[in-house]
């Protein structure tokens, strides 16, 4: 128990008498009229206190309110004045606060502050100004408190000016304006949020009312309230605290100054928080019983400052050396407030300010304060529908989400939430600390579940880790004992913090909880997705960003999103996200957004307005200064931009925001971002226009702004590359219009002057030179010609002025409806931004030089040095990389850190890094013999590498999957095996020839100096002139085979190179496996990279029987050297088991391949039919075509190390740079991206730059391009002659024949062949099927289809399932033969060979009898050639029809190709037998081939007659689309002629009437129109439109 303090001798009783109003003074208080006149003074008291050193401090004391109902008159002298509650206070349930204002004019400098600060003129009455000497303290039950300290309160300063008309004061300041208009109103205009958040000590009226009820009628209230009423009460009591200015309730003048009573809400004041506002100007505290004040003395400044620095806590220690100076007069020792103070439950103002409780009952005064304060305050705000001025008062809240700070976990903090660690009261930018910054403070409402010790420790440590406690001052014996403060007693902790759970009568029953859960679930189902729905949305997104949120409410628009955006998790699961269009505050419910709209003070983007014309404005926002705004802007833009990746790193960007202005504000419509620190790289990084504003031309307007800024910066800007589809559409339209306008101005200079350059156009438009060149070349207005020595080109202009005039007319017409840029309205000055301006470190020149030196020092070893070290020194050694590769191929997966030398012992030798040397023939022979003997004892296989290599090759150059001989130019020799020399045959050159031929594959590219030179063979037989098959007629004779044997291993072409002086043992090349890639690379320059491999290891295909393995290669070679018989006879004499078919010699296989008559498999290379002229129809041997085929076998032996090789080059390159890249097929669903419109010939949009109105997926299909029409289902009569089957009635479907009866796409080079009456390349219906690159090994033509991927199976052309696909799919595919399967995403320029076209034409011809009604429905070749080059405006990859839609066609017999076993060719004997059978079959087929074709199409000249799967039938029926169809780029589809077209009625009446208007299946859906490579279009299957 403590004692009372001694009265301080420093203060006299006279001062106390002056400061204590007597009953007489209270009776002389002004009336209501007088108070009305002095309202402004009370506002001055509250608003004129910003700096204590310059102005004044406000002293107040919180007076007690009697718990008993106040029914006496306020002016009754019998009632204690300060404790009496005025009538207005009782009515509004507010607490009157008394201020003592003491005048000390000498404290002010009259010259500095002038008359306005020296005195205040109010109602013709001069009142002295407020002096900065007042002190605030609170009575503590008539005794000192443990932690008595000054409660200082300061407000932003507002200059006071008198309004002579109404007598009120208008407060002016740069950031705060408030006018008191009504003296009776309970609230005033709010002070700016940035100045008042840290002093938000006032609450809203309803909350004040509830707190008053809670204080005065706690027991009665909670005993009589039902649960529903308590919940309503709870919702009111937890509303957010807002700032209000106090109003005057009473006013009186004294000798020393003015005493005013201001009703103030019941607040939680914090001592340390007030001290933090006070700062160093901490004043000495003196305790008074009635009205307390402070005096600032020079003697006490040092001690006071020390105490201030050491007691920055929410409960600072009381000042021990400042005893009370107030001495009561004798006879008046009793405190007038003693009766009230004795009933006070909690004297800690930082916990609960002036709370009353009944001593005979459990305190329930806080009413769920601890529970409710931890809930989200934003949800509370929506519970009020109050339309009062308090609710309408604008206020800028802190955004809900801030990526740079943690989310508030306990937002219901005290009203006065000030960060005590700050030395000043405002932030650097003038804003106040937010409520989240006080989360670290101990001012939050304690959790009732926590223990008393934890609660007390948490509050102490939150503000200050170490708390200095000073002993209490000595008390005199006269002082009666006093109790310790309630905060010191842990037992009384709950009494100090009364909450509703302390009330035993407050019980939540199970029924109440069930009702609450039902209501909560109902609201959740209405506004949020369930977990199951969220899971389904993420599952349907297939690994991509789920389209969440699905809808947004942005201003006056509700829009469906196009893509998902990474909003915080709690905002993702809502069905509709609400976003403020001014500040981008986002909320989960409409109630929260409505409440935010009442408080949001932003009506324009927080940046600098650089452009305004009419109702259009552009603002420049710095991503660093307005980080939260820009981050939310990026999150919003991600919902409409698929390629948006930057969300939170907004510091290095400027955001230029376009708004549409009205009376409400500047509404956000779109924006573009630009790099801040490197403005000369890209003038635009990201651009977005909201879908609701996409019809106004704002996209082009923003592009105009970006180029205007670049022109002011005096450099040629451009967008960041690569452009997206929408970006290319917008920029394409802008570039075309801008360049056309510039050319119109420069027409005279171009036509009649010296000409123009790209630089001139760039200077005029600001567009980058590369973009200008791309546009003018794509439009055909210019082309580069005449390159000079430096490869510089000149431009040859050929401007289509008609097109230019059309573009300019369209541009002029759009100015009436589209937003146009006006250069006169731009107010912007370029400035150079550096990272150092934003606080980032900027590298100096020295640091840049050091970084460059460090980068130069870190370089790779030169190639020739590394290759020299990696080269083995002998034939038995290999590079380490090869050792690792072989180990992996045999199932090993060993780490790099292991010692490979020990792990591969007895198999390979790890090379010793020494200089390479040449090996002699004897050394090579000895090593080879040893290797062969080892392999006879132990056989092992190595297939992993071959499988891997084949899979890699298949990705780039697909191979044959169907049986038949390979007709592709093989670039590699087939891999050998253990028994690959089981056949004895004459070899005049002996072992040296074999060794020379085989040795080239491995050592031809390797020398110590890294160079290459041609090989010099010492064999006299090799000096003979070599002859190739190109110089010989096509025949299969013994002499040819013998010559092939004699030329084995010789230098065939000049491209063969080897290291001079190297000699290799016989048959050394048989064991060559991996190195042939190096030979291919050196030969044509386009081969694969050379990879080191185990060349000396006998790599076998499969394990054979032990007795079969004993037949070694050396024994067979000895037999071959002794044998003198012919090659074919020798082949028949050698008996090889069938089990060893796959182990035949490479030489034998080569002979068999050479014997194959290539004449019937002449798939030409591009040179064969691009450069050579077409030929006559007479079939004859063609050495020109054969030359390309013979090159396959005349090259060096290393070409056959792999099973298969890349196919011949097709019509054009695989990666056609001129072909626009296709768009990925879009899935219909919630996450669909906006379907793109089609590009024109030049690759750019022909319409406006803005996105079309149907960009958003939710709009659905349009009537023009995506309407699904019922298909006509005629009974199709199949041609039995063509299909070799009976004609059967089938349901109509739009697929083509699977066999070669349907033709393929034709290239322009092939069109030239058609127009020339010369002989086409010789072809046979049994031509080998050729797989196109990227098809995964699937042949481009032929009856067999292998769908390797779901994409290929799903892309069914001219089939009913494709008709139902969206336009985004239908517009991104090209017309293609149903037999052609090209990879999705590849160029559409992969064509087929003329032989396939002729084959398809010949098989598709119909006789007169098989035609419709005896009429030949196949048009003449002249008619087809006229339609060749029509409709060439689409470019997309085709796909293959499904197997279910293929017509079964009996394919003509195809000679079977050597089947593969484990990736190897079969035996020579089997190949020889197949060769003989194939020769006989080909001779039988060659004779009737041409007459049969002539009979099939009499009157049509023999030539390439391709029939394409184009939507116009062979009878030249009218297009399926009417004239002026908006999407004219779609190819025309077969449809009956319209009756309003007379020429169709006259010309095609008979074919249409036949068979009820149905045409045969063979001709349905075919046409002869031709496209440019890479510009084939796909059309939807909407026949019958």
Curated annotation (Swiss-Prot):
Bias (Basic and acidic residues): 23-37, 302-312, 844-855, 947-956, 1029-1046, 1070-1081, 1135-1151, 1196-1207
All residue ranges annotated as the MYST-type HAT domain in the record: 544-830
Main function: Probable histone acetyltransferase. Required to initiate and then maintain lateralized gene expression in the ASE sensory neurons. Involved in determining cell fate in the ASE neurons.
Regions of compositional bias (Low complexity) in chain numbering: 431-440, 1164-1173, 1482-1493
Ranges of Basic residues composition bias in the record: 453-469, 1047-1060
UniProt-annotated stretches for the region Disordered: 1-37, 279-491, 844-903, 927-1262, 1286-1373, 1431-1507
EC code: 2.3.1.48
Source species: Caenorhabditis elegans
Enzyme class: transferase
High-level lineage: Eukaryota, Metazoa, Ecdysozoa, Nematoda, Chromadorea
GO-annotated cellular components: chromatin; MOZ/MORF histone acetyltransferase complex; nucleus
This protein's record includes keyword Zinc-finger: yes
Reactions performed catalytically: L-lysyl-[protein] + acetyl-CoA = N(6)-acetyl-L-lysyl-[protein] + CoA + H(+)
Protein name: Histone acetyltransferase lsy-12
ZnF start-end (C2HC MYST-type): 577-602
